[in-house]
Amino acid sequence: MINVEAQSLTPGEHGIHIHETGRCDLPDFETAGSHFNPYGTEHGLENPSGPHAGDMPNLLVGENGEVVNYQTEISTPLSGGEESLMGHTGGTAIVIHADRDDQMSNPSGNSGARIACGVISPG
C-alpha cells in the first residue's frame, strides 16, 4: 500500500510514478531515472501491453493544494531481488508530475515535468 501526503501543489490531477533510481536532485529530479520497469512492459494502466511496475493511478490535488486521500496498492514487492523496489543500491523514487497521466502513451503518459520527488529506501 502506498499513501501519499503532499501540499502546495497545483489543484487537479497529476501523474505519479515510481522511478528506477533513489535520487531526487534539483532542479528537475531527472536523477530519479525512468519509470521502474523491470519487466520491460509498455507504459499505462490502460495499456494492454502494460503497465510499468511503477505506474500508478493519477493523484488528485484539491483546491487547497493538498492531496485528496491518495492510497493505492502496487503488486511490486518491497524487497526480494532486482524486480523489487529495494532490489538495487539506492532504492527507488516516487515522482509527482505537473499534468495528469493519460495511462497509455509511452514513456510517461504525457504527464509533463517532474514537480516533486521522494526517495523510497530501506529504513
Task: Describe each model-derived feature in a short phrase.
Residues 1-13, 18-123:
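N-terminal leader/targeting pre-sequences
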